[in-house]
Amino acid sequence: MDVASAPGVSSHPPYYSKPICSSQSSLIRIPINKGCCFARSSNLITSLHAASRGVTRRTSGVQWCYRSIRFDPFKVNDKNSRTVTVRSDLSGAATPESTYPEPEIKLSSRLRGICFCLVAGVSAIVLIVLMITGHPFVLLFDRYRRKFHHFIAKLWASISIYPFYKTDIQGLENLPSSDTPCVYVSNHQSFLDIYTLLSLGQSYKFISKTGIFVIPVIGWAMSMMGVVPLKRMDPRSQVDCLKRCMELVKKGASVFFFPEGTRSKDGRLGPFKKGAFTIAAKTGVPVVPITLMGTGKIMPTGSEGILNHGDVRVIIHKPIYGSKADLLCDEARNKIAESMNLVS
């Protein structure tokens, strides 16, 4: 086995069907006697530390596995030997069950990512001037929908993505008019989802974590567009976010949710949270499901600095009406899941 070819992090589960001492096992059995003398214990620990210099240990999503919760090699009152199981960088190379190896990033993808950031950054700086200039008039005449700001956002998103990937949009006839308040929901695969959805030109308010609002230019634009802030893992912030969204819908604006709550790391559709559908059920507005495919391959989660080649497909489903949040949630998720399965 070539040690130099071992990947950095192993992502396989902590238990395997193969014998623990087989040549392909990634678990190393180290028998240690708790009743050994101090000198033998010190020599053993010193040997282990010396061996660890050649093989880097890293956290791989699970904790180290011990047969005993507490282990002290210097205690002499217990003569029972026990086994310590450790995980190393060699595990990813030796175990065929490793499912998510680190992908090799091509130089062209890195260059495309740099160009994408430059185009998006320069266009944002230019267009933010128009948004700031028109903001007082937007507050006076269109305080809730803010169509002018969303037009600027559509222009910015289109300029940013047009040179790098094509977007195939299906079901444009299912989009309600911009004056009709709706609750839009979609699967979430990549940072590019925001750009793709903004390019549709609909005036909807996204939900975004508060940390993004402090970013210059981008945070200013989000505030002027009326993006709703949310502190993750804060119950009070979640309640305030839902109240704010319900108020916007009652005033005639539309809101956009990613019901999964976060980006999918493997492209699979996760479970939906019911907050968006509760708003739709209480206000009586329709739910418009949207399926996004391809963004996760072009810019994977955790690799926002690269941009692979590929195309994006957007499927806009027919609006769903209902008065029960559970039924709305199940129907919207089923529509998105069916379209993803048909394409894949």
From Swiss-Prot:
<keyword id="KW-0150">Chloroplast</keyword>
<keyword id="KW-1133">Transmembrane helix</keyword>
<dbReference type="InterPro" id="IPR004552">
    <property type="entry name" value="AGP_acyltrans"/>
</dbReference>
<keyword id="KW-0443">Lipid metabolism</keyword>
<feature type="short sequence motif" description="HXXXXD motif">
    <location>
        <begin position="188"/>
        <end position="193"/>
    </location>
</feature>
<comment type="similarity">
    <text>Belongs to the 1-acyl-sn-glycerol-3-phosphate acyltransferase family.</text>
</comment>
<dbReference type="GO" id="GO:0003841">
    <property type="term" value="F:1-acylglycerol-3-phosphate O-acyltransferase activity"/>
</dbReference>
<keyword id="KW-1208">Phospholipid metabolism</keyword>
<dbReference type="GO" id="GO:0016024">
    <property type="term" value="P:CDP-diacylglycerol biosynthetic process"/>
</dbReference>
<protein>
    <recommendedName>
        <fullName>1-acyl-sn-glycerol-3-phosphate acyltransferase BAT2, chloroplastic</fullName>
        <ecNumber>2.3.1.51</ecNumber>
        <ecNumber>2.3.1.n4</ecNumber>
    </recommendedName>
</protein>
<dbReference type="Pfam" id="PF01553">
    <property type="entry name" value="Acyltransferase"/>
</dbReference>
<keyword id="KW-0594">Phospholipid biosynthesis</keyword>
<comment type="pathway">
    <text>Phospholipid metabolism; CDP-diacylglycerol biosynthesis; CDP-diacylglycerol from sn-glycerol 3-phosphate: step 2/3.</text>
</comment>
<keyword id="KW-0812">Transmembrane</keyword>
<feature type="transmembrane region" description="Helical">
    <location>
        <begin position="210"/>
        <end position="230"/>
    </location>
</feature>
<keyword id="KW-0472">Membrane</keyword>
<keyword id="KW-0808">Transferase</keyword>
<dbReference type="InterPro" id="IPR002123">
    <property type="entry name" value="Plipid/glycerol_acylTrfase"/>
</dbReference>
<keyword id="KW-0809">Transit peptide</keyword>
<dbReference type="GO" id="GO:0006654">
    <property type="term" value="P:phosphatidic acid biosynthetic process"/>
</dbReference>
<dbReference type="GO" id="GO:0031969">
    <property type="term" value="C:chloroplast membrane"/>
</dbReference>
<feature type="transit peptide" description="Chloroplast">
    <location>
        <begin position="1"/>
        <end position="49"/>
    </location>
</feature>
<keyword id="KW-0012">Acyltransferase</keyword>
<keyword id="KW-0444">Lipid biosynthesis</keyword>
<keyword id="KW-0934">Plastid</keyword>
<comment type="function">
    <text>Plastidial enzyme of the prokaryotic glycerol-3-phosphate pathway that converts lysophosphatidic acid (LPA) into phosphatidic acid by incorporating an acyl moiety at position sn-2. Utilizes palmitoyl-ACP (16:0-ACP) to produce phosphatidic acid containing a saturated group at position sn-2, which is characteristic of lipids synthesized by the prokaryotic pathway. In vitro, can use 16:0-CoA as acyl donor.</text>
</comment>
<feature type="transmembrane region" description="Helical">
    <location>
        <begin position="113"/>
        <end position="133"/>
    </location>
</feature>
